């Protein structure tokens, strides 16, 4: 049995989020929370919330024990991009792309 949680349109680059997800993939849930708590990145705060949601889904919807859960899958996809323009000299305008992320965390019970 698996439980999942998804956070969509997080205003953060998928590249920066992916680095933090690599740290917790395959780890026990308690160990993953400890890693995220001491990781000094903005993405760690968001991933911590998504992981808490996935654990809550497992406990409440599937009645799984939180002590036996591990992070089986976690990945990030690119969300929609906000397009902005930065005015420059002599009437020019440069495009700024503000990327968003869709974060998915899946937890399973160890057999």
UniProtKB/Swiss-Prot annotation:
Keyword flag Transferase = no
Molecular function GO terms recorded: rRNA binding; structural constituent of ribosome
Name any GO cellular component annotation: cytosolic large ribosomal subunit
Which ranges form a coiled coil? none
One GO BP on record is:
translation
Q: Name one Pfam family in it.
A: Ribosomal_L22
InterPro entries on file: Ribosomal_uL22 (IPR001063), Ribosomal_uL22_bac/chlpt-type (IPR005727), Ribosomal_uL22_bac/org-type (IPR047867), Ribosomal_uL22_CS (IPR018260), Ribosomal_uL22_sf (IPR036394)
UniProt KW keywords: Ribonucleoprotein, Ribosomal protein, RNA-binding, rRNA-binding
Quaternary structure and interacting proteins, as annotated: Part of the 50S ribosomal subunit.
Q: What does this protein do?
A: This protein binds specifically to 23S rRNA; its binding is stimulated by other ribosomal proteins, e.g. L4, L17, and L20. It is important during the early stages of 50S assembly. It makes multiple contacts with different domains of the 23S rRNA in the assembled 50S subunit and ribosome.
Q: Which family does it belong to?
A: Belongs to the universal ribosomal protein uL22 family.
Specify the protein name. Large ribosomal subunit protein uL22
């Amino acid at each position: 049995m698996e439980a999942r949680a998804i956070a969509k349109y997080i205003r953060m680059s998928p590249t920066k989020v992916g680095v933090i997800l690599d740290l917790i993939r395959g780890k026990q849930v308690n160990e993953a929370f400890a890693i995220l708590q001491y990781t000094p990145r903005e993405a760690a705060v968001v991933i911590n919330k998504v992981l808490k949601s996935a654990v809550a889904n497992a406990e409440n919807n599937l009645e799984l024990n939180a002590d036996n859960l591990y992070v089986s899958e976690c990945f990030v996809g690119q969300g929609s991009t906000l397009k902005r323009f930065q005015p420059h000299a002599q009437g020019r305008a440069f495009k700024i792309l503000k990327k968003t992320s869709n974060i998915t965390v899946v937890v399973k019970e160890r057999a």
